[in-house]
Amino acid sequence: NSKVTRQEHRILIDGVIELGWGKNKETTYIGALESALSVTDRAFSYESLMAVSGLAFRVRWWRGEDEEGQQFCPSSPVGEFETEVERVSNAIGWVQSVDVRFDRPEGHYGFEEDLPQIQASIDAGMPVMCYGKIMDVSVVYGYIEDSCDLLLMDYHGKPGEGTLVSASQIGPMMIFFGAKADHYAADTWFERALFTAIENFENKGFKSKTPGMYYLGEAAI
């Protein structure tokens, strides 16, 4: 469905949905996913993706093991965790290949090495998702020829304009779209959304790499 165009030295995918705060699409993973999929044959609404991922029905809060120490983490509300990504991939019938590099020094994530793959995806009309300069999920929808510069649709750019970012400045996460399968039928989509709502409430949570726990559902309240 997507159309790739050239504007001087810019190679762009047309029609990617704009992102921004104050649009009732504050979960950046789902907002970026809706935007990226909008130019494919697997376009789904923000609301549908929030439902089937379980994020619409999830309360999560991180607390550190040391009661005198940190008791909140900014990652508490984010959507791009393994469980939610897997749920969405199953629903849309499209594998999301997630590359996370938090173990590398800040600012040295190495995604410039992936520039040929990013550009090839854009050339094929398929956006890529990543963290930009700020760790909110963005959509790579274009690039500048003969450079390392990428065009991002993100939550922090000016309306009507993309954000120009070097491939060396993105990360530490990137998501490529991989193999396709059948997506859920409408009744299965609804059924899975209800199931995840119950699962999120009954699940007590899970331990984090940093000493602490992500509490879910009733345990998080």
What are these regions (language model features)?
Residues 2-105, 123, 129-135, 143-221:
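Cys-His-centered catalytic/binding microenvironment captured across papain-like cysteine peptidases
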Residues 101-120:
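Mixed-charge, Lys/Arg-rich low-complexity intrinsically disordered regions
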